[in-house]
Amino acid sequence: MNAARRGFKDGNDPVVARLMNQQRQMATSMGQFLGEEVLYVMRGIARGDSAVPIAAAATNVSCPGRERTNEGRAGFEGTYKDAAPVDIRLGLLRVGDVMIGAVNAEVFNPIAQRLKRESPFKATMMTTLTNGSARSGYIPDDESYGKYTFEVLSSRLKPGCAETAIVNGILGLMDTARRVN
């Protein structure tokens, strides 16, 4: 029986007690290690400029939508019909030379990696599930659309639009934000 369940019966089992104690010790050790590493990094950080440019911008992009017409789990091809276009909200926060792109949906990692590659700024990152929730579901990168994973099957976006729209949209916001001094 799972020792984490309420009212578990193995509570008096010495093997379970030993394993639970080991888990507590490991969690404590990891916490101490993390705390020491944070202190080490903090000591090495040079104080930066006190006045850096700060800017924010937002826009929407729209991509063709789809509606799934069959049921099934991962591993089986989905069938779809055309649906209303899906709006995706994009944002950007600039703090000095750091660019933080934002998307209001859960974006596959290759899209964020592409943004970082194409960004003219060395310090570029992407946050997701930001500024509300898109009705898109997951947003796969173009290459992933051929895979029958739950995330791809459940996406309400047709292939071939969202990846480029997101990357180009955030790069456009960077162009706007770079003019702020």
Please state what every model-predicted region is:
Residues 1-181:
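Non-catalytic substrate/cofactor recognition surfaces at enzyme active-site rims
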